[in-house]
Amino acid sequence: MVLELDFIFHKDKLFTVTFRYNNCKKRSQEVIKMIEVRNLGHKYNSFTALDNVSFSFSKGVFGLLGPNGAGKTTFMRILATLLSPTSGDILIDGKPLSKEATFIRSNIGYLPQHFHVYPQLTAIEFLDYIAVMKGLTNKKIRHEKIMHVLKEVNLHQKAQEKIKTYSNGMKQRVGIAQALIGNPSLLIFDEPTVGLDPEERLRFRNIISKISDEKCVLLSTHVVTDIESSCRDLIVLNKGKKVFTGTVEDLKEVARCRVWEVPVRTTSETSDYIVLQIKESNGQLFAHLLADEKPYPYAKAIDPTLEMGYMALLEEIR
């Protein structure tokens, strides 16, 4: 049986990929356990997007941080088999990605950064289409799975409405739902909480927390608190290079004894230092400054957050 699948996105548009499900039917029940990235590189003409990157991750939620242009999306597109690396390889349970493309595609849930839908379809119609393309041929089972993921993302009461009537946040939740359809063992989320309000962002965190024991989840986001609350391990990329791998606590330690809280009385007090955060308490403004030594006699050292550790790391390598 050959099915034409056009649910994968490339350059913000849909394109068709042909999967031969008969070739991987038995393997579709296999679970991806380990992903190893070995000396991965990719160039767009003369621009190096990834430069000799190596790391590994397994079941659980693995965080991917980095500023714009760091190479995060390029890596995720390579892992999703949408892009071939210029050098190096990715091993899926010890086997080269280039030889496992069909298996990966039948076991992946992918939410790209720029997710598009068919606006004339309802959420149920769109997800039914995706489910069929992912090989769910039993109509009853398909409907049950669709309603399950719609409840997970809190769209079940809007399931019969056309997607064109949805807000941007609701469309993003449709994107999360389509990634979850088919019970994939590898999930790739590129900026999944963009456009979500705080309640829905918390709901997303709960979703991936529930499934993280069974699946490999790669989470890339600029919302550092999402990484802090969901991940144990992470990697930081900058200008295509790996600049950090370790635990969330390890990255926090980069800023240990380097973040100071001072009351803001004049702008000159903070002008010579990197300001990580401004907060208000009892009508008084306080600044969190990054400094290797105590900047003022009245400065107080505070415990760093992940965002503080991340900013301190980027400042070190600037």
Report residues per predicted region.
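Conserved ABC transporter NBD signature motif
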Residues: 88-99, 103-104
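ABC transporter nucleotide-binding domain
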Residues: 204-288
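Conserved ABC ATPase "signature" region
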Residues: 128, 132-135, 140-158
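Walker A (P-loop) phosphate-binding loop of ABC-type ATPase nucleotide-binding domains
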Residues: 67-71
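Catalytic Walker B motif of ABC-type/P-loop ATPase nucleotide-binding domains
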Residues: 187-191, 196
